[in-house]
Amino acid sequence: MDIKDEKALTIEKACTINVFAPFVRNVTAEDEKAVTNKKHINSSATVHVFHGVVNRTFKTKGNTVGLPKSFSKAVIETLSYKPFAPICIHSRSDEVVNGFPLIYFPEDLASHDISGKDWKSFIHDVNMACSFSDVALMGLDQILNLVSFGLSAYVISYYVEKYVDKAKFPIIKGFIEMWNRKFFNPRKTHVYFINSDEVAEQRAVSIKAYQQGKGTKGLFSKFNAQREWKKQHQDISSTQHSRLLLISL
């Protein structure tokens, strides 16, 4: 797909929802292990690439070649899309190359015509992109060679034209924006990728708001308020993990 076929391509605006807000639900690698009943999740690049390619279609001709199979699903215009609380999915580790947990949310996503198979395909796509997160330093020829691994020409073109000098984790952002445009947005949902630096910024904002809410003024009282905040958020306070934030529109 030529990038000229796409109109109004713009870099996604920053997320305005703080991932530490009390109404945000959090999902971690431990939840994935509990759901799958596995102590170890294989998060190797080989596994990510394999599933990313399997979930794409190569049998048809035209603009659908190399794109996820879910993109061919027709949108149900008469469906009533039920809003749900934002879901924050933490990366499996502080190394984003290990990807994100694969957990489906039937009560929230089924009402948006997003099946377990669709969500699995998306997570596999993101995890495949995570495996390629270091390609920001590659040359153009090397990037284009990634098409053989299932990367669509759309993502590559978007990466080269829009992200190469303007964003961290360009391949991951390219994949997610493609899914938002082609699949999630028409179904009244949206996914943000929030890297660890952005998580740290949001945590600082959340801590400051907590301190202000407690009416702290001196250094000691601010320090105690910060300790209280960290204790309340001890399971999700790490800034080393990137996040996926799933919201309803």
UniProtKB/Swiss-Prot annotation:
Q: Which domain of life is it from?
A: Eukaryota
Presence of the UniProt keyword S-adenosyl-L-methionine in the record = no
Location (main, coarse): cytoplasm
Which keywords does UniProt give here?
Cytoplasm, Nucleus
Per the database entry, which stretches of residues form a coiled coil? none
Q: Name one Pfam family in it.
A: DUF4646
Locations listed in the record: Cytoplasm; Nucleus
Task: Provide the Gene Ontology terms for cellular component.
Answer: cell division site; cell tip; cytosol; nucleus
Q: What InterPro entries is this protein classified in?
A: DUF4646
Q: Does the keyword Transmembrane helix apply?
A: no
Identify this protein by name: Uncharacterized protein C1198.03c
Q: Which organism is it from?
A: Schizosaccharomyces pombe (strain 972 / ATCC 24843)
